[in-house]
C-alpha cells in the first residue's frame, strides 16, 4: 500500500495543479487528458507495469528514455485517462497507480495535464482543436 505521507503530498499537488490551471483561465468544464508518469530503470519491469496499467483501463503511451538530474537513464511511460478537474477522482487514480507502482517495482512520478482554452474552437467530428498549434507549444503548457 502506498505511503500515507506520499499520498498526502500527491493530494496537495493535485489541488495546486487544478488551482493553477483555473487561475490561468483553463476551462473548468473541459475534459482533460490526465497523464500519470511511471518510470523505472529496467525496461522489462516497466513493460510488465504498463500491461497492468492498461488492464486498469488507462491508455498507455509508448515507452521512452529520459535522463534524470543525476545522469541516470530511466525508461518511462504515461498512463492517460480523460476526466474533468475533479480532485477526488484524480486522487483515486493517483492512489491506484501508486499502489500498482509499489507492487510492480516502478516509480509513480506524479501527473500533469494541459491548459484547455475555454474559447477554443473544436471540430465537431473528432474534438480536435482547429487552431494549428504545434506540439512544442502544447508541451510548454503542461502543468
Curated annotation (Swiss-Prot):
Compositionally biased spans, kind Acidic residues: 117-135
Locations listed in the record = Cytoplasm
User: Quick one: where's region Disordered?
Assistant: 117-143
Q: What GO terms are given for molecular function?
A: endoribonuclease inhibitor activity; enzyme binding
The record, for Pfam families, names: RraB
Where does this protein chiefly localize?
cytoplasm
Q: Which InterPro entries match?
A: RraB, RraB-like_sf, RraB_dom
A Gene Ontology term for the protein's cellular component: cytoplasm
Q: Which UniProt keywords apply?
A: Cytoplasm
Record note on quaternary structure: Interacts with the C-terminal region of Rne.
Q: Indicate the family of this protein.
A: Belongs to the RraB family.
Matches recorded under NCBIfam families: PRK11191.1 (NF008393)
Tell me the HAMAP family matching this sequence: RraB
Q: What does this protein do?
A: Globally modulates RNA abundance by binding to RNase E (Rne) and regulating its endonucleolytic activity. Can modulate Rne action in a substrate-dependent manner by altering the composition of the degradosome.
UniProt name for this protein: Regulator of ribonuclease activity B
The encoding gene: rraB
